Amino acid sequence: MDNEAIRTYALKSGEGRTYNYGIDFTVKAGELGPGRRVAVLEYTTRSGEEPPQHTHTTEDEIFYVLQGALTFRCGDDTFDVEDGGFIFLPRGIEHGYSIRSAGDVRLLVITSPSQPDATGGWGGFVGDLETQGEPA
């Protein structure tokens, strides 16, 4: 890994690069650039905007619920996760979520490893945001 190309930085609440890709996603740590091994996004969603059940073949996904309540399905298991809750979704297992709370749900999502050159699925999604998303 080329650590010289990576610099230390801190972001305040609400900071990051925000792109609209149907909904606004704020990139806290992107996929583009040498040495990237993790991608971190914050976004707000609501009932009706949930993704379909899907599988990531190359990366694990971690959700930290900043606000709201969701039900996650991962394989045959179901988990209720609320404010301050965390869920780890391993690669290779079909998963998705449904929103249980009224109003906005705020999520911090971490994927590892990031996949800037991947096509399809989550792999490369953050890189796509950074190159194709409309700045919000």
What are these regions (language model features)?
Residues 1-38, 127, 132, 136:
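A short, N-terminal "cap"/entry segment at the start of jelly-roll beta-barrel domains
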Residues 9-12, 76-94:
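Short acidic-glycine-tyrosine-enriched beta hairpin
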